[in-house]
């Protein structure tokens, strides 16, 4: 998003508020206009959006403005480069895009909502980042390779994966930067301004790293699928004979985790969970296993073969206490499972959970 000069009406339109609201924020000192008929910049939109979000959450705008005037708080950091990437409304509505692309409005709405976007009316302007998704939706609808159920399922997986990544990034920022900076005596204003400067270096590298990680995961999943297809073809041709294989589910539960949380606090519990995640990921990968769902004090894992699940489970029972974690209870069950949306269901799953309990 390029920073352009805007008049009050233009800024109100971008931020989706009234011009009177812009005037009120100027009077309060939340917005600081320059001289001339176009006293605002496109980046002021983020200040309006943040102030509006605070007010909708029940935070008094007058009190926020008082902190800004006293120098204890500032929205100036929102003008930094990392915030220029956030999308603004486009010049076309959902209805217009639907008409121009041939994608039904309901398909457009369901797919965008599955990816974390939201709309209230087909006649409101689409965000520019939503427009980036439209070609994919159009191609999926035109080729019919995936139906609406599957495209929304894939969209939900994209959104959940990215939401988790953004959430953990934010947790890392708070723990490793914001809290230490505030503890050093600097105020919230200085902390946010310094963070914006540093983020300018990190953000482009994070974008590249995310795509690299995604492509690596595609390589792993696609290769595994191709190997299974080749194996099936060889079996069908009689070139190899394999015994029938069934997957296995493994559940790991830390004994006394709740009591430990109460005694040591939430931060200690979070650190234990992080240690467990690294250990489990390492042991599972060596036995063709994959962590499927983290359950706070435990984890559910899927294995391609029961032997790998048993070997991995024994390693977890042995290694978990060595890592300074509470004793682990594990349960392993082999049998057919139902896979949907990246999760696993069925009697095998329930039995594994029951054994670990």
Kindly label every feature range from the protein language model.
Residues 232-315, 319:
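Catalytic NTP-binding/metal-coordinating core of nucleotidyl cyclase/transferase enzymes
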Residues 37, 123, 263-264, 341-345:
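Short, solvent-exposed loop/turn segments at secondary-structure boundaries
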Residues 302-357:
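Catalytic beta-strand-to-alpha-helix segment of the class III nucleotidyl cyclase homology domain
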Residues 121, 289, 325-329:
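Short secondary-structure junction motifs
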Residues 42-45, 128, 266-270, 274, ...:
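Short, conserved loop/turn and helix-capping segments at secondary-structure boundaries
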Residues 154, 202, 272-276, 312, ...:
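Hydrophobic alpha-helical membrane-association signature
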Residues 111, 280, 296, 332, ...:
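Residue-level signature of catalytic and energy-coupling elements of molecular machines
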Residues 1-235:
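Arg/Lys-rich, alpha-helical DNA-contact motif
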